[in-house]
Regions:
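Generic beta-strand/beta-sheet core signal
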Residues: 123-126, 152, 187, 197-199
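A short acidic (Asp/Glu
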Residues: 17-19, 132-137, 161-163, 196
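Short acidic/polar active-site loop segments enriched in Thr and Asp
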Residues: 13, 119, 147
């Protein structure tokens, strides 16, 4: 069975869409540390930015280009839990538009990531968010077109990523020991939130 994991790190200031293919549960390229990215203007990261000019929306790097009579939306992720219902509703609309932009970019580039039998999507969100907002994020990604969407809090997702991509370096530093369980405090500092997660890690086991 071949499958693809699409990882979406929707940040307050920037967003990254990671791609990793697996065959029978193992990395298809034999390298657990290698990751592919959906690119935006040749970059593996895109500003979480929306620009509106009359009835037209621009996203990411396009939204950074000054235009006449523009309206800029930034940090809308942090307004998803606003106590102001109007502000929250606008943030939800903008988030859905942004996710559609991300999905269109993925669809345009997926041919370069190879053919798989199944696709799954993992989206992260701040640990402090309510269950309602977490469900909204999953639903938003689904509405945009992403397949089989699941959610995970950001510090835990960051720990999984670091334990895979930076394992050898962490072992060299003594933060992880081969064959032994380790407790790692993950501090995920973003533009809008800072989350902490205490994780138990052992090579070959789940965190």
């Amino acid at each position: 069975m071949t499958e693809r994991l699409i990882g979406i790190d929707f940040g307050t200031s920037t967003t990254v869409v990671h791609i990793k293919n697996y065959t029978d549960g193992r990395p298809s390229d034999g390298d657990g540390t290698s990751i592919q990215y959906v690119e935006f203007d040749g970059q593996g990261v895109v500003p979480s930015l929306i620009q509106k000019v009359e009835d037209t929306y621009y996203f990411g790097y396009d939204a950074k280009q000054p235009k006449k009579d523009e309206k800029i939306y930034r940090n809308f992720k942090m307004k998803l839990e606003s106590s102001d219902e109007k502000e929250q509703a606008e943030a939800e609309k903008l988030t859905l538009l942004f996710f559609r932009f991300l999905y269109e970019a993925y669809e345009e580039q997926k041919v370069h990531f190879g053919t798989v039998q199944m696709e799954k999507t993992l989206i992260s969100y701040p640990a402090k968010w309510t269950e309602r907002t977490r469900r909204f994020m999953v639903s938003c990604a689904e509405q945009a077109g992403f397949p089989d969407v699941r959610g995970m809090d950001e510090p835990t997702a960051a720990m999984y990523s670091v334990s895979v991509q930076e394992r050898e370096r962490m072992e060299a530093l003594g933060a992880l020991e081969k064959g032994r369980s380790s407790y790692v405090l993950m501090i995920d500092m973003g533009a809008g939130t800072t989350d902490l997660a205490l994780c138990r890690y052992k090579a070959g086991a789940q965190a």
